[in-house]
Amino acid sequence: PSYVIALLADRDLSSAGITAQLGGATARVAAGPAAIAQRLDLPLYAVSIHYEPLSGERRRRAASPWGLVLTASPVPAPQGPKGRERVVAHTRAWVAELGPSIAEHAADWHMLQPVFDADLDQDRLARSHAREQQEHP
């Protein structure tokens, strides 16, 4: 049997977060999905969901004017030795894969906190990272 494990890969403002370009802006994202894929030698997919208006029979059967579209795209693992650099490259690749979907369906992207580095308090972020380094050298 085959299994799919969905992981919410959200922003990661810790010093372990990986900077990646999302829609032309820098964001800090979680390394977890790429790290797990690498560690277990499993494929990684970028998955997006957006709404689409329904009409006719589809609308009647759904009992809703809206339908959900789920798109899954494989994100090939980068070549080279395993380790942090490969996790960083793989993470940036899945963010790049999701970027166009988010741009195309921005109204369906619900983020309730700042995502982009430009929107963060940089002094607070630096203090947080310094604290992490002191606690976990």
Feature map (PLM): residue ranges:
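Non-catalytic C-terminal accessory region of glycerolipid acyltransferases
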Residues: P1-P137
